[in-house]
Regions:
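N-terminal secretory signal peptides that target proteins for export/translocation
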Residues: 1-11
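Bacterial N-terminal signal peptides
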Residues: 15-27
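Short, conserved active-site entrance elements at the starts or edges of catalytic domains
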Residues: 150-187, 207-211
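Acidic/charged, solvent-exposed loop-and-adjacent secondary-structure segments enriched in E/D, K/R, S/T
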Residues: 129-157
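Gly/Pro-enriched, hydrophobic low-complexity segments
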Residues: 117, 179-275
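N-terminal mature ectodomain segment of secretory-pathway/periplasmic proteins
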Residues: 45, 51-53, 58-137, 169-174
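Signal peptide processing junction and immediate N-terminal pro/mature segment
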Residues: 25-42
């Protein structure tokens, strides 16, 4: 083969190679454009603002956690109590019944009350049932509303979950007297305006009262709940209130007297379902 023909042949090969390479680039570019068009643009990730704690409030938070049992209080998962519950209407006892309560935090409970033919209330997140001798039914909306609000701001969930949620503001509050007990307040404000006040015993740092103001989803009016805790006893290293009184809009609506309490008991599978 002559040198001239060889050069021509090599030039042809290079042209073919460049053409194939350019075609590959075009194909890759087309695929990238198709993928870009098929996939919607991703929104930039935003970091949640952590809770904001006033430096003067931090010692109060540390004190109440320590008083309640420190790590033992922070780590337990279930609580089983037995005792008596009073329903109160117009400051008159409307009902009295023995009860058994099983709670798996943060939002599951099985609450049975009554003697011969007990009624059982089961809550599992947004699901809520009532079981009695006639069978199974759904809890009334007002029951569900009160349960969800009261468990969200219970002493356990407030101090283990709520105060750590994004954008929560925690500040020291004023001093007060609750049931003749001198208290120091902590003001907790959630995004959206819900305000919670935690009153601590000034000597022991144990919670005496939790007050929370929540907008009723049905009436759109603001309801003020107040839970008063007393008669603390050491149970498995955790200071446990054995007497609880609940107020709604300044009216006493229930009282609970616990005879016994146990932590971290195991419950059967499906215990927080109506078939459990």
């Amino acid at each position: 083969m002559t040198t001239e023909r060889t050069d021509v042949w090599r030039g042809s090969i290079r042209i073919i190679e460049l053409t194939m390479l350019w075609g590959a680039f075009l194909q890759l570019g087309l695929r990238a454009a198709q993928n870009t068009a098929a996939s919607p643009p991703q929104a930039p990730q935003t970091l949640s603002t952590p809770s904001r704690i006033d430096p003067k409030a931090q010692p109060l938070l540390d004190g109440v956690i320590r008083a309640l049992g420190g790590p033992a209080f922070l780590r337990f998962k279930t609580m089983t109590t037995r005792g008596r519950v009073y329903a109160i209407e117009d400051e008159t006892t409307a009902g009295l019944a023995p009860y058994v309560s099983a709670v798996e935090y943060p939002d599951k409970r099985r609450f049975s009350y009554g003697k011969k033919q007990p009624v059982t209330l089961i809550n599992n997140g947004d699901q809520a049932w009532e079981l009695d001798r006639y069978g199974q039914t759904s809890q009334r909306p007002e029951q569900v509303y009160r349960w969800k609000v009261s468990t969200r701001y219970s002493m356990e969930n407030l101090l283990r979950l709520r105060i750590h949620e994004p954008s929560v503001l925690i500040q020291p509050g004023g001093v007060d007297f609750v049931d003749n007990v001198p208290t120091q307040g902590l003001d907790i404000t959630e995004p959206g305006g819900t305000h919670v006040r935690l009153d601590l015993n000034r000597q022991t740092f144990l919670p005496v009262r939790i007050t929370y103001r929540v907008q009723n989803p049905t009436t759109r009016e603001w309801d003020e709940f107040s839970d008063v805790y007393g008669d603390y006893q050491n149970v498995q290293g955790i200071m446990t209130p054995m007497h609880l009184t609940r107020y709604l809009n300044d009216e006493r609506v229930s009282e609970t007297y616990r005879n016994s309490a146990r932590y971290d008991e195991d419950y059967p599978a499906g215990y927080f379902q109506p078939t459990g």
